[in-house]
Structures are given as structure tokens and as C-alpha cells.
Amino acid sequence: MAIKTLGAKAAAALDQELMSTGAFSIDQLMELAGLAVSQAVYRLQPLESGRRILVACGPGNNGGDGLVAARHLRHYGYNPTVFYPKRSKNDLYQRLAKQLEDLDVPFVDDFSSAVSSTDHIVDAIFGFSFSGEVREPFPAVIQALQETKLPVTSVDAPSSWDIENGPPESGLGSSFMPTALVSLTAPKPLVNHFRGRHFIGGRFVTPAIASKYGFEVPEYKGIDQVVEVETTGQKL
């Protein structure tokens, strides 16, 4: 199946349509996205290969997806740690954080130190709406992500990448190539610059909505919420 992509404007319009015509709530979409991410990590990082997962969360919806993923990973038997330096005051995000606290999932302030004691990193900092410069406190985090030898799974977009054009030509993030990418709902144009393992998580989009936005819903197997698709990188 040829991969069709959605630009930032189309992706935003699709999200709005899912919450209007599709009758989904933001809570539902975030839960489904985080579940998909957790299933991708489960494939990439089997429990016997290391249970320590560091989830880096940004202040927006991408970070919310990361919080949901961390909860599911905890229930799978992993030991997630969450880096969430810019906590939102929004009730939804506060509830997601409370759910993790109730599961004794630790929140850390020092990302660099946390990297030294983890087995896999989930990059849930910036999503498809990111543009401009990376602001504090995230430049050091992006630098650590591009320097680490650990596997990194990015949620919808490798943080610092332009949604249309991929990694910056120079400077921060220019050499950041995560191990895996989980495209949510549908891949974004940046996937054309990606060279790792690629998963799609969107097992809630109706054929009618997919057709309207010009992409196909991939064939998901069994009860899977993600499907791995071919890239020029490693494939399952």
C-alpha cells in the first residue's frame, strides 16, 4: 500500500472532523493514540529486553498521548518514568498525571540523568502542530535524544522536525533520527525523511472520513491498534 500523507492543516482539520462529524471527544482520541503508542513500544522493546521506559512529554496533546502511553505501559509490566516539565493546568492533563501518580509512576525533573538509567525513550514532546524554534526547557532534551544510543520512539513526529520538510537543515535536531515513529491517524509528510521503523495508529477512522482526506486505513491484524508499514529503514 502506497503511503499517503496529511500536511499540518489537513491533519488539524481531520482532528476537528473526528470530534464533530465523528462524535469523538478529545479524551477518546488521546486514549486511542496513547494505546497505539504503547502497543508499538511493546513490539519494539519486549519486557525481557528491558522494562525501564522514559517518556518525555510536551505541554500539548502530544504530551497527553505520552501520559496515556505511560499508563498502559505500566499495566503491561514496564517501569515507566515520566519527564513532564511544563505541566498543563487543563483538567484532562491533570487527570492523566493523577492516574500515573496513583500507579506510583515517578515524574522526574532531570532528563539527562533519567536517560542514564533507562532502556527505551518515548519522544512525546512536539506533534504535527510544531513550528518555529524549540523553547526551554526542551533544547537540552532534543540534544540528548539525538546523541543517545538508546532506542527512541517518536509520537507522530520526531520532536524538532518540521511536519512538512523533516529535520532541520542544521543545528538542533538536524541529526535526530529516532528508532521508530508512530504516525497517529495518518502519516505526515515528514515520513519521507524518516529512516526507521514506522507504525500507524489510527484504528478508529471510518472509511468515509479517510476517503474524504485522501488516505487509506491500513489493515490492522486481530486486536492490534498499530500496524507496521514499510520504510527504507528496518522493518518488522
Swiss-Prot record:
Catalyzes the epimerization of the S- and R-forms of NAD(P)HX, a damaged form of NAD(P)H that is a result of enzymatic or heat-dependent hydration. This is a prerequisite for the S-specific NAD(P)H-hydrate dehydratase to allow the repair of both epimers of NAD(P)HX. GO terms for cellular component: mitochondrion. Its cofactor is K(+). InterPro entries: YjeF_N_dom, YjeF_N_dom_sf, YJEFN_prot_NAXE-like. It holds the Pfam family YjeF_N. It comes from Fusarium vanettenii (strain ATCC MYA-4622 / CBS 123669 / FGSC 9596 / NRRL 45880 / 77-13-4) (Fusarium solani subsp. pisi). This is NAD(P)H-hydrate epimerase. It catalyses: (6R)-NADHX = (6S)-NADHX; (6R)-NADPHX = (6S)-NADPHX. It is found in: Cytoplasm; Mitochondrion.
